């Protein structure tokens, strides 16, 4: 089950438990966010395409973190005139984990993440030199 959502002027294909990076969203880390602009939805059997949007389908996510990208340098130089301009820009972004896609009576929820515990390595005794 997946959906295509629109946020920040871009489109993203999302499924439950996906992690996507989008333009800045309001809210603190851990807050829930709902995406209302759903363009396409499929549950494996049938596909619904909006004209342009679908109604009755909800995509819910959780804000993981906010951040900024690497600095992009814009450098202008006019030759032989000792004229230079150096300007930098860093774009803000938000990382979101999709928790649920719901359509009518069908729901696709993200399963809890399984974390592996580091198993202690079997300690081998040093070989005795005889």
Swiss-Prot record:
Spans annotated as Disordered: 103-130
Alphabetized UniProt keyword annotations: Ribonucleoprotein, Ribosomal protein, RNA-binding, rRNA-binding
GO biological process, one term: translation
Bias (Low complexity): 121-130
Family from the record: Belongs to the bacterial ribosomal protein bL21 family.
Complex and partners: Part of the 50S ribosomal subunit. Contacts protein L20.
The protein, known as: Large ribosomal subunit protein bL21
Gene symbol of the encoding locus: rplU
